[in-house]
Amino acid sequence: MSNEFLPLCRPAIDEQDISAVADVLRSGWITTGPKSAELEESILRHTGAQHAVSLSSATAGMHLVLLVLGIGPGDEVITPSMTWVSTVNMITLLGAKPVFVDVDADNLMTDVALIEPLITERTKLIIPVHYAGASLDLDAIYDLGERYKIPVIEDAAHALGCEYKGHPIGKTGTCLFSLHAIKNVTTAEGGIFTTQDAELAARIRRLKFHGLGVDAFDRETQGRAPQAEVIEPGYKYNMPDICAVLALGQMKRIGEITQKRTELALHYRDLLTAVGGITPLSIPSYEHRHCWHLMIIRVDPLICGLNRDQLIARLKECNIGAGIHFKACHTQKYYRENYTAKFGEITKSLTNTEHNSEQICSLPLFPDMNFSDVERVVAAISEIVGNK
């Protein structure tokens, strides 16, 4: 069995993808242009959404959608603390209050039973998070939003390739997908906004490029329209072609990528049943198709004899990468020290979030792995846990 370093992740890039990037470099048009437009069309075909806007990151998209919805001082936005901190940062930077909702103890996603008690007259938005490649139970969450007249924006950073009740995430509602380097499909850095709302899409497209009345690339004139004027002050959040082209080939292979990740993840799950104190996340029982963005386990220190951080350090000694997705937002230094002074008392019951934040560990998972790599990781964990 190889002892070469096995990283936590590696992008699913092949030689054709590399050649496509080189073609863009040779073309003379490397910023936002035809390849960004092609990527948007590819996302539309895959998801079935009505509108797609390519962006420099999903975080940029979150900033813009919060702005368009008018989120600001005095408003509350309900979102999990068990997520990457970008959403919470954007809410905070706009002067609104992030209201942290707890998650299910075993799949680490929130639901209506946890969200509804947190709704107040100040609640202006709900941002639930698809987690690790599994889908939220969307119908119930959208029904809740409609009942209270509160919009829902899906944080779908982990969910490109995931399905809910037979339809790709993005088919309905409004979503933000991440195309960061660690994601199942990557542009190195980037994100995609999808929606069924034409007016919302038009605002996002305008705001992402200085507030101009055209995109960075005018698709009819094959270049920037010289008469373009600023309709409203905007930002510089467009995705360049040199990034967009990288994902085009991956989007053609997304079914293959998802299938390989699924096979590897299920092999992990089979083998880990024999390792005491190590528990993978549960798979939700409602109808959905997991795209296995992450392979997450929980490390029970009482059974394993060591904690999560110690396991990660020991795996590193075995030339195996591992990570944490995520340290709960409300436990991060800034929010630990400033939340109460800025926003008042934090949500009282975040028990499942806090418990899992101390135990979760992400194991290597990427399409270039094989079953022997999975077996190597599980064997290392078993030996570490057995030897304490």
Swiss-Prot record:
InterPro entries: ArnB_NH2Trfase (IPR022850), DegT/StrS_aminotransferase (IPR000653), PyrdxlP-dep_Trfase (IPR015424), PyrdxlP-dep_Trfase_major (IPR015421), PyrdxlP-dep_Trfase_small (IPR015422)
Gene Ontology, cellular component aspect: membrane
Single Gene Ontology BP annotation: lipid A biosynthetic process
Domain of life: Bacteria
Record field: catalytic activity: UDP-4-amino-4-deoxy-beta-L-arabinose + 2-oxoglutarate = UDP-beta-L-threo-pentopyranos-4-ulose + L-glutamate
N6-(pyridoxal phosphate)lysine: residues carrying this PTM: K183
Pathway assigned to this chain's UniProt record: Nucleotide-sugar biosynthesis; UDP-4-deoxy-4-formamido-beta-L-arabinose biosynthesis; UDP-4-deoxy-4-formamido-beta-L-arabinose from UDP-alpha-D-glucuronate: step 2/3; Bacterial outer membrane biogenesis; lipopolysaccharide biosynthesis
Keywords linked to the UniProt accession: Aminotransferase, Antibiotic resistance, Lipid A biosynthesis, Lipid biosynthesis, Lipid metabolism, Lipopolysaccharide biosynthesis, Pyridoxal phosphate, Transferase
Gene3D superfamilies assigned to the protein according to its UniProt record, in alphabetical order: Aspartate Aminotransferase, domain 1, Type I PLP-dependent aspartate aminotransferase-like (Major domain)
Its job: Catalyzes the conversion of UDP-4-keto-arabinose (UDP-Ara4O) to UDP-4-amino-4-deoxy-L-arabinose (UDP-L-Ara4N). The modified arabinose is attached to lipid A and is required for resistance to polymyxin and cationic antimicrobial peptides.
Full protein name: UDP-4-amino-4-deoxy-L-arabinose--oxoglutarate aminotransferase
Organism (species): Shewanella sediminis (strain HAW-EB3)
Lineage: Bacteria, Pseudomonadati, Pseudomonadota, Gammaproteobacteria, Alteromonadales
